[in-house]
């Protein structure tokens, strides 16, 4: 898909609305990880340099009502007091993000205390001003399932501009007012530089990758990755399956997995996927040895198991050295690598070795000329933890959105933009 971007429209003197993804982790009113803020800077800097009348930024930050309800329920269960107002102020207000963005852009970022009713405030600012509106999800209309309610809310937002730029890849799979309805009400609707880059790297991986291609799919559950696996079986030369989901596949082959995480309801699904792979000539790489533990905790004693079968009293926590050698063999000389999900409990240092070596092998393949794409929150956290993000061709900013693309799905927040 060739998208029109912010570089394809004239912005001088225009009112520009940008949907960004500033859904960042917050603690006590402080930004804990500014990766998504940093990712938006190239697009915003480019737009500012074009001399627009103003730039209005729209974002969400968590889901205030749902998050507060959950936290309040947990507090009641534990018999603890709960201050709903303080909770929302500490985790869902975008003012700290405006301050963070101002430092990165090197220009003032004005903050509007609401996302509606701000036209007079915005138009009273000097030309070229940048304004961040308050959390769009403070208004339930944003996520309403009622099309008329969403459109009415989107019309409120449409008053702020003539050109819509979507640079919020992380929400592109959501059919929300600010991502899908709003752009249809604007004179021009184009992609930001971040979305353009995401589509440029991710779409070929699932539609027409350079071969040989190796897909690495990990994480805890088969149930959350069925559509991804089915999609990748159509394009991959080899499929490496690791993490907790690997034990469901091993059990489907009659392998003993001890007390490892298994989704018994999906064993037949795992068998079906293995049969599809065999019919399609796709090599499936499952663990042949393991690093195990008797309990699931950070200080558990690692136990090496040099066999595909796991003893009854142990659970798999990471892959072993023979499995890593198989990874090395399959990744040597590849043209494309897609990685979604860790192959072990990398959050625990004692069980991080497999995921660390995998990341290193993918980095080496990239150095040798392969195109590598990393998508999914845990994989992104892993390459960042091991200091290897800069050696990947592309590290996606979208968890759910990248997963939907890997499934071969159309993203509504992108399909509504100009091509």
Swiss-Prot record:
Substrate binds at residues 21-23, 36, 60-63, 137, 174. Pfam families: PGK. Pathway: Carbohydrate degradation; glycolysis; pyruvate from D-glyceraldehyde 3-phosphate: step 2/5. InterPro entries: Phosphoglycerate_kinase (IPR001576), Phosphoglycerate_kinase_CS (IPR015911), Phosphoglycerate_kinase_N (IPR015824), Phosphoglycerate_kinase_sf (IPR036043). The keyword Cytoplasm applies. GO terms for cellular component: cytosol. It is found in: Cytoplasm. Monomer. This is Phosphoglycerate kinase. It comes from Treponema pallidum (strain Nichols). The gene is pgk.
């Amino acid at each position: 898909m060739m998208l029109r971007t912010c570089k394809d429209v004239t912005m001088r003197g225009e009112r520009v609305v940008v949907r960004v993804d500033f859904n960042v982790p917050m603690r006590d009113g402080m930004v804990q990880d500014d990766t998504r803020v940093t990712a938006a800077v190239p697009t915003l800097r480019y737009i500012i340099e074009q001399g627009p009348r103003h730039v209005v930024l729209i974002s969400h930050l968590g889901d205030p009502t749902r998050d507060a309800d959950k936290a309040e329920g947990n507090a009641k269960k534990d018999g603890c007091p709960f201050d709903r107002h303080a909770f929302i102020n500490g985790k869902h207000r975008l003012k700290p993000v405006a301050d963070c963005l101002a430092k990165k852009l090197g220009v003032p970022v004005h903050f509007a205390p609401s996302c509606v009713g701000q036209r007079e405030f915005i138009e009273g600012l000097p030309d070229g001003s940048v304004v961040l509106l308050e959390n769009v999800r403070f208004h339930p209309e944003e996520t309403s399932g009622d099309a008329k309610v969403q459109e009415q809310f989107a019309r409120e937002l449409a008053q702020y501009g003539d050109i819509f730029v979507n640079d919020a890849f992380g929400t592109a799979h959501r059919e929300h007012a600010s991502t899908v309805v709003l752009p249809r009400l604007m004179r021009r609707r184009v992609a930001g530089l971040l979305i353009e880059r995401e589509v440029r790297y991710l779409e070929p991986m699932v539609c027409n990758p350079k071969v040989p291609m190796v897909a690495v799919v990990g994480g805890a559950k088969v149930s959350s990755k069925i559509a991804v696996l089915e999609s990748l079986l159509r394009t991959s030369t080899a499929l490496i399956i690791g993490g907790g989901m690997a034990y469901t596949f091993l059990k489907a082959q009659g392998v003993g997995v001890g007390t490892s995480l298994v989704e018994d309801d999906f064993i037949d699904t795992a068998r079906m996927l293995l049969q599809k792979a065999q019919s399609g000539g796709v090599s499936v790489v499952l663990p042949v040895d393991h690093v195990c533990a008797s309990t699931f905790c950070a200080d558990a004693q690692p136990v090496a198991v040099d066999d595909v079968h796991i003893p009854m009293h142990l659970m798999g926590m990471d892959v072993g050295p023979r499995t890593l050698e198989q990874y090395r063999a399959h990744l040597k000389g590849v043209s494309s690598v897609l990685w979604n999900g860790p192959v072990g409990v990398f959050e625990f240092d004692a069980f991080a070795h497999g995921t660390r070596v995998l990341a290193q092998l993918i980095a080496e393949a990239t150095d040798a000329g392969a195109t590598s794409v990393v998508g999914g929150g845990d994989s992104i956290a892993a390459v960042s933890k091991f200091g290897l993000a800069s050696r990947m061709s592309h590290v996606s900013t979208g968890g759910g959105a990248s997963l939907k693309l890997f499934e071969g799905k159309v993203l509504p927040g992108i399909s509504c933009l100009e091509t």
